[in-house]
Amino acid sequence: MSYLLDTNIVSETIRRNPNKAVISWLDQIPAEALFVSVLTLGEIRKGIEALPDRRRREKLRLWLEHDLPAWFEGRVLPVGLAIADRWGRLLAEVGRPVPTIDSLLAATALHHELRLVTRNAGDFDYPGLEVINPFG
């Protein structure tokens, strides 16, 4: 069983006071079963660059550029042709406007047969997608 982590799960790991249930859940899963999307890395970059505290921003830049790639080495999933195709089919199946990044994450999870792990389970109501909320 493998998992695609949403941005809020990855970000939780570097919070000053992370949610204990999330950390406990992550500790129980082998690292090789955890995946992230390049979209998550982009969302994290956006958040870091918007931080007003220069020292915190620099610390998190190092984490994003060094620690995070090491944690997910070989498990950062791109958005390529196959994901774009799965995304288009998913949007047609859903038949309603949906957020682009969330729906691309859903398509990525479905394409790779991963469970999506997020705090925002309600944002990922897509056919066939299994969603896990470790926040409890």
PLM segments and residue spans:
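Acidic, PIN/NYN-like endoribonuclease modules and their adjacent C-terminal/linker elements
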Residues: M1, A106, L110-G136
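Short, flexible helix/strand-to-coil boundary loops that buttress conserved ligand/catalytic motifs
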Residues: I14, L26, I48, L91, ...
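Active-site neighborhoods of divalent-metal-dependent phosphate/nucleic-acid chemistry enzymes
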Residues: K46-P52, A70-R119
